[in-house]
């Protein structure tokens, strides 16, 4: 069974969002809304006890007490491959995957409470039993909540790109995060990543190329003129954030590539679209803005 500490430290609502740090380290999110209304409120009150993992907190409202361990076999009532999605949003991807893969179990990790409520609504409407949700800070989930080598796949789709240079330290995928991801994954487990920003795609590729714990499953593929990065650089579609006209009175935010004709991506390493990743409303907005989607797939050595 899961181990629950006797007396978790009190929660400090909003502390992580306010200061942007936890345990002296930057966090990758801002909690923009936690209030529930209507269907979301009703779903949370009626079903959260069953579908939401009630973790003991540590020092903040999304922290996980370091003594707590998630026992997937006890929670799901069986031993099955566990897939974890970090930043599950409204739950479209994880719920679809759970429906298509009844032989696997899924854990949706999110800090946006309305998104988790939406996920619970979808779980109930489809009669699924192989999905759970947890409101928690992702690095803590991977570092201490999940047992070492317990995750068969890790998904991070469209993380916040944190465009401004002074905010790059808040990007989720950093060397330290790669280390805790490797700790949670089984040997040979997959880490699937998608982003609609070329600058973040390059950042991810650099971080994981520098990791000795992962190998790129598509090393050298889709390079040169076939690279989506080359296409973005040469088109100049990301000359300002959004690839669209800047609103009146607002300054453009550079993504560090102003195009056109900036060069050719000779490194490549981009994966084909993962069949299990459905096109969500969030991704649709990226396409409408003219941005390209970058997929990367790594395997734990």
Curated annotation (Swiss-Prot):
Record InterPro entries: SAM-dependent_MTases_sf, tRNA_(Gua-N-7)_MeTrfase_Trmb, tRNA_methyltr_TrmB_bact
Pathway: tRNA modification; N(7)-methylguanine-tRNA biosynthesis
Keyword Acetylation among record annotations: no
EC number(s) on file: 2.1.1.33
Catalytic residue list: 160
Residue positions binding substrate: 164, 196, 280-283
One Gene Ontology CC term in the entry: tRNA methyltransferase complex
Alphabetical list of Pfam families matching this protein: Methyltransf_4
Primary role: Catalyzes the formation of N(7)-methylguanine at position 46 (m7G46) in tRNA.
Family to which the UniProt record says this protein belongs: Belongs to the class I-like SAM-binding methyltransferase superfamily. TrmB family.
NCBIfam families named in the record: tRNA (guanosine(46)-N7)-methyltransferase TrmB (TIGR00091)
Stated name of the protein: tRNA (guanine-N(7)-)-methyltransferase
Encoding gene (name): trmB
